């Protein structure tokens, strides 16, 4: 019989290889964002949409539509200037699970507009979902 430590290591490697924890974190983030009345059906729907997108090589579905993105941006842009700070931008990406804690994002001094925010979110979402 295998030692417990060996089985634990095998389990850990399996989860890492298949990126299961990242997938669960993303699904949880979207579940908490949407707060559907039927969470199980919602999660099944998300996974099915991802499976179809991957199998048919079509674009991955965006789980936050434009109105959600605009609302999030407007909450951060409380002064209505049409831009947010780099710190706000980075925190939003972290909160959505689109930026890892150890990822280094460099502030290039440019302002973050709604278009920049939306484009970067969509790019990161597509990249993230394509890994699963």
From Swiss-Prot:
UniProt-listed PROSITE patterns: EF_HAND_2
Name this polypeptide is given: EF-hand calcium-binding domain-containing protein 10
Keyword Transferase: no
One Pfam family it belongs to: EF_EFCAB10_C
GO MF annotation, one: calcium ion binding
Organism of derivation: Mus musculus (Mouse)
Alphabetical UniProt keywords: Repeat
Statement: the UniProt record of this protein carries the keyword Repeat: yes
Domain EF-hand: 64-99, 120-132
